[in-house]
Curated annotation (Swiss-Prot):
Species, as recorded: Escherichia coli (strain 55989 / EAEC)
GO molecular function, one term: monoatomic ion channel activity
Listed transmembrane segments: 10-30, 54-74, 99-119, 120-140, 149-169, 186-206, 223-243, 258-278, 300-320, 322-342, 343-363, 371-391
Record InterPro entries: Chloride_channel_YfeO, Cl-channel_core, ClC, ClC-type_chloride_channel
Protein name: Putative ion-transport protein YfeO
Subcellular location: Cell membrane
Gene Ontology cellular component list: plasma membrane
Family (UniProt): Belongs to the chloride channel (TC 2.A.49) family.
Membrane topology label: Multi-pass membrane protein
UniProt entry tagged with the keyword Acetylation: no
Keywords: Cell membrane, Ion channel, Ion transport, Membrane, Transmembrane, Transmembrane helix, Transport
PANTHER family per the UniProt record, alphabetical: CHLORIDE CHANNEL PROTEIN CLC-E, ION-TRANSPORT PROTEIN YFEO-RELATED
Amino acid sequence: MLHPRARTMLLLSLPAVAIGIASSLILIVVMKIASALQNLLWQRLPGTLGIAQDSPLWIIGVLTLTGIAVGLVIRFSQGHAGPDPACEPLIGAPVPPSALPGLIVALILGLAGGVSLGPEHPIMTVNIALAVAIGARLLPRVNRMEWTILASAGTIGALFGTPVAAALIFSQTLNGSSEVPLWDRLFAPLMAAAAGALTTGLFFHPHFSLPIAHYGQMEMTDILSGAIVAAIAIAAGMVAVWCLPRLHSMMHQMKNPVLVLGIGGFILGILGVIGGPVSLFKGLDEMQQMVANQAFSTSDYFLLAVIKLAALVVAAASGFRGGRIFPAVFVGVALGLMLHEHVPAVPAAITVSCAILGIVLVVTRDGWLSLFMAAVVVPNTTLLPLLCIVMLPAWLLLAGKPMMMVNRPKQQPPHDNV
């Protein structure tokens, strides 16, 4: 017979698996539709019209129209496409289900149109809202927080293709009764994360790792080099942290989301022309292209890092629906490659992984997630001790510093003013 503790853990196992599978399927459907629309906008349509897909006019035109389209969705859809991600953490309170259709449409348009944001925040919002709404109806005795945790874990597993990230994140957030062991509290979320990861793996495999030269034995000087790289990435990220609320406030003085997002899309188009097609979109496929291109110089990597960081700030400040983690990883990779080109004596594995650690730490203020992203992009077990050590001064630098979020004015409603 099972112990009562085991029976308690099993109570939510079936809902956890169902939520994990559903979270992954929602992500897959959204990404497939966005990919098809992206192919239409950036491959088939310019080819039919006889226009180069990297033409400045095409880049500016598509991104401007994308901004206008997203603005129209936010202006006229019920619920105004959910909350502004610039004002929200990755895992937030559930939104009304009526806001989800507009949010999904706004996300798909942004992903396909080349906006420098990832899918993580809107997908998380959608999955949490659905899990809470459906779960509360089917199992009303289970509180909303449990459904929120399960949906968050399933989404994280689906996004990253592994339950490891969910285990790391929730190990520091599930601060329940001290009488309940941590792994008892992690059981159902890990079931959801595993189900989400396995379901995603049936359709596609998230490809984060880069072909970076293998790092051998750790030296004491490598720790110092890694700490300096992380500090440089943090400094760059804190510039973005300073700019985001100020630009957000300035742009939203116009009140009309169609105008705000149209201008934001136009600015993103100009940045895209300067940075080229590799600086567009969420950044995961593009960072693979960046590493594969042997023609890039130190100045090219620097330009890409600056353009992508600026595009991230503009997209978030304008109110596009998307997450900041994936483009931040691109910025970290560009910074790391730039520093390696500038100082070849420091291995690229160190510069890239420590730059990712620093910039993701600024964006998420989550040590485990930052370590995870650095470790999966540069998969090398020799780096793990170094990354853990480098995390310490990086965390000290950011202690008490502002988050990469906008404080919502008290008079503003839960969703964008329109």
